[in-house]
Amino acid sequence: MRAYELMVLIDPEVDERTVEPTLKKYLEVVTNAGGTVDNIDVWGRRKTAYEIQKKSEAIYVVVNFQSEPAATQELDRLLNLNETILRTKIIRPEEQKITAE
């Protein structure tokens, strides 16, 4: 299992109350493959740095989860098929190194 961080930009016309339940439906791919969802953090509506699909705002969501690489690829594929999702990015956060001084 590897730790991942997913950032999703969702169409601002979507009701913010439906964002988390909708994402949980997609995150079932991770849990069905034996992974865990650690945190879903809805940042809310924010201005984007540049227009994405002719929209200058988006609803930002950050999800921390642990999964196998195959389940992560399938999650990314399914999210990109949804028309209300403007952009996705999945990264593996770097482990912090503890140094003794």
Swiss-Prot record:
| Classification via SUPFAM superfamilies | Ribosomal protein S6 (SSF54995)
**Pfam families referenced in this protein's UniProt entry, alphabetically:** Ribosomal_S6
What keywords would UniProt list here?
A: Ribonucleoprotein, Ribosomal protein, RNA-binding, rRNA-binding
Give GO terms: molecular function aspect only. small ribosomal subunit rRNA binding; structural constituent of ribosome
Q: Does the keyword RNA-binding apply?
A: yes
One GO biological process this protein is involved in is:
translation
Tell me where on the tree of life, at the top rank, the source sits: Bacteria
Which residues lie in coiled coils? none
GO CC field: cytoplasm; ribonucleoprotein complex; ribosome
Please name the InterPro entries in this protein's record: Ribosomal_bS6 (IPR000529), Ribosomal_bS6_sf (IPR035980), Ribosomal_S6_plastid/chlpt (IPR020814), Transl_elong_EF1B/ribsomal_bS6 (IPR014717)
> What family is this?
Belongs to the bacterial ribosomal protein bS6 family.
Q: Which PANTHER family match?
A: MITOCHONDRIAL 28S RIBOSOMAL PROTEIN S6 (PTHR21011), SMALL RIBOSOMAL SUBUNIT PROTEIN BS6M (PTHR21011:SF1)
Q: What does this protein do?
A: Binds together with bS18 to 16S ribosomal RNA.
The protein depicted here goes by the name Small ribosomal subunit protein bS6
Organism phylogeny: Bacteria, Bacillati, Actinomycetota, Actinomycetes, Micrococcales
